[in-house]
Amino acid sequence: MIKLSKIAATVAFALTSGVALALPVVDDFSVSQTKIEDYTTADGAVWAVQAAGDDILGGFRDVYVRKDLLANDTALSVSALTSNGSFSYSESTQQAGIGVVRWDGISTGGEVNTNGLGSLDFTIFGSALNVLALAADDQSPLTFTVWSGVNKLASSFTILSQEGPGSYVFNFSDFVGADFTNVGALELQINNGTGSALDTRIDMVSVVPEPGTLALAGIALLGLGAIRRRKS
C-alpha cells in the first residue's frame, strides 16, 4: 500500500504542477546503516557512517546516539540501526538517551550544516512533516528541528508518541519563526535523555501534501486500481 501511495503522490504532483517532481519523501530508510551503540555517559555521541542515496533528502543521512543514563550501567546501551527499510532506536532496561537522524547534506558528524540543503522550499510539497512509525513506546518524545530563513535559525516542535504504530503530523505552522520556503537543514530526535527504556521504529519521514493534492492522490489510487483490475 505504501508503494502504491508513493505512485499516487507522484501522479498527483504531476497533475497539479504540470511537470515531473521528486516524491515528497524525506527518507524512506531504504539505505541501510550499521548498528551503533553507546554504553557510556558524559563522553559525547556515537556516530554511524554517513549514508548516501537518492531516496534521502539532500542525498545524505547522519545518525547518532548518545547515552545519558545510567552512568554505572556500562554493560547496557542505547542504540540505533537502519535496515530492512526502517530506522530503529532502542534503549536497554533503565537506560536513557537520544537518537538523532539528521539531513544536512554531505557534512559528516559534529555541528549541523545549517545550509546543507541549500535553502530548499518544502512548501512546494505540502504543509506538514509526517513520521510513520511502525512501533513506539507510549510517551516517547519525537522532536523535529528545522534550520530555516535567511539566517538559518533553529525552530523545534515535539510530539509524544502513543504505544504501537502511528502517524505523527508536524504542521509547518507549529514551528515558531520557521520559514519552510527556505530550509537549510532538518533533524529528528527520538527521546530527550530522560525517559528510560523507550523504543521506536520508523518506516518513513515525508512531507504531507495539501488537502487538494491528497484528494488528487486518492483519485490517482482509484485510477491505478482500475488499471490493475483491467490487466488482471
Task: State what each model feature region is.
Residues L23-I98:
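N-terminal targeting leaders for non-cytosolic proteins
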Residues M1-V25, T194-L221, G225-I227:
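Short, threonine-centered small-residue motifs that mark membrane-proximal processing/anchoring sites
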